Amino acid sequence: MALSTATKAATDALAANRAPTSVNAQEVHRWLQSFNWDFKNNRTKYATKYKMANETKEQFKLIAKEYARMEAVKDERQFGSLQDALTRLNAGVRVHPKWNETMKVVSNFLEVGEYNAIAATGMLWDSAQAAEQKNGYLAQVLDEIRHTHQCAYVNYYFAKNGQDPAGHNDARRTRTIGPLWKGMKRVFSDGFISGDAVECSLNLQLVGEACFTNPLIVAVTEWAAANGDEITPTVFLSIETDELRHMANGYQTVVSIANDPASAKYLNTDLNNAFWTQQKYFTPVLGMLFEYGSKFKVEPWVKTWNRWVYEDWGGIWIGRLGKYGVESPRSLKDAKQDAYWAHHDLYLLAYALWPTGFFRLALPDQEEMEWFEANYPGWYDHYGKIYEEWRARGCEDPSSGFIPLMWFIENNHPIYIDRVSQVPFCPSLAKGASTLRVHEYNGQMHTFSDQWGERMWLAEPERYECQNIFEQYEGRELSEVIAELHGLRSDGKTLIAQPHVRGDKLWTLDDIKRLNCVFKNPVKAFN
């Protein structure tokens, strides 16, 4: 039987390039490259407007054996600590209740990002032409599989060994109720796997990992430790050990297209869009989770953001890519303004919509209010007084018949959803830089909170057609939606979400039903 072309090529290459007698990993890596050949045509299923060079190198030069050995050691350390020492020390119940709720969101939402990163890096493997570059992407595919399991394990560990397991144990089902879910899908799903393959690399590797890994995965371990959580640092620092290779993959993606004429034409616009897509969600959500989802504070979110995003990434990291024509995103200045107030604006809305969550929220106490005012002068007059009014009206007590969403309606502060980012905003109450912009397309009204998202939508309106929470549930009563989407604890009547983290005065489905709260689409006022 005649040999296939591929088999013959491999046989001839092996005959010409004998296997190394050494077990040195770098020598083996060099030997493996001799099996490469030039493609007449790139047969990828995933189109890109850029041409990725065929000679691009991989910085870390991993081979499968070395990769497996390295990751096995890390997993032994991680799971050994979790299943032995931390369990014996009853670490799960020593976590502050507010932080326990924060991890319901962080670990579950990050799991979605890691899961989609599997597909994203697999797509890049298929699109790349250089064998070394493919090898780097393939190692990242394996990393992302590992990280998906790790994030899921954090929820599992808290559900089994921690306090208040509701939300940890079924977050994949209950997370879809509230407005934070679709915004998360926009950055962690659509941004990573939809559209041009190189654009996906910019979203995932150059922005998501190189820019936001430090303020997310590294910073979260500091906040976790400060609030009694030893589980999260054990897992997330293990995840972080892989991230440098992922950043290098993003760097090499840019290197591979540097000489392509399309790079000069499209790259900086695509990078700006990727950065704004990621920061529009991460900047307010991470700041909200860290500062409002903790009892013991580390440092103001704005300082963390400035250090890692503005200075380290926007200045140093992007500066290193300057020789390839890469420029800092034009939207970086506006993002810096968002870092100061946007997370405070978002928490007002998150607390107002607390029944739609899969986690418990809590109003800032007096000590926390003083911390906010000291680090964000003017915070109390704008936000603190509102929280005090809500507390005085009994927002934590189900017998009060009051949820803060009613306050927004009473005071004519409509809540909108940004069509591109899917992040809620209230322009009449925002202290950050949110301005209401409205467009009509195909008979549907679309709202936007900033010029950058508006520009992306105007360029590709068909790309942003996802229904928001008010469109999806318009005309439906709130308790009906909560029950349908499994927002109840195991007793079948008590809500998973609560407006406090205590064990008493828990809201039930009947309490919500008595409010007769019906979803309305605020854009109907423009018709």
From Swiss-Prot:
Its EC number is 1.14.13.25. Fe cation 2 binds at E209, E243, H246. Keywords: Iron, Metal-binding, Monooxygenase, NADP, One-carbon metabolism, Oxidoreductase. Fe cation 1 binds at E114, E144, H147. InterPro entries: Ferritin-like_SF (IPR009078), Phenol_Hydrox (IPR003430), RNR-like (IPR012348). It catalyses: methane + NADH + O2 + H(+) = methanol + NAD(+) + H2O; methane + NADPH + O2 + H(+) = methanol + NADP(+) + H2O. Pfam families: Phenol_Hydrox. GO terms for biological process: one-carbon metabolic process. GO terms for molecular function: metal ion binding; methane monooxygenase [NAD(P)H] activity. SUPFAM superfamilies: Ferritin-like. The keyword Phosphoprotein does not apply. Its cofactor is Fe cation. The active site is at C151. Binds 2 iron ions. CDD domains: AAMH_A. Responsible for the initial oxygenation of methane to methanol in methanotrophs. It also catalyzes the monohydroxylation of a variety of unactivated alkenes, alicyclic, aromatic and heterocyclic compounds. Belongs to the TmoA/XamoA family. M.capsulatus has two forms of methane monooxygenase, a soluble and a membrane-bound type. The soluble type consists of four components (A to D): protein A, comprising three chains, in an alpha-2, beta-2, gamma-2 configuration, is a nonheme iron protein containing an unusual mu-hydroxo bridge structure at its active site and interacts with both oxygen and methane. This is Methane monooxygenase component A alpha chain. It comes from Methylococcus capsulatus (strain ATCC 33009 / NCIMB 11132 / Bath).
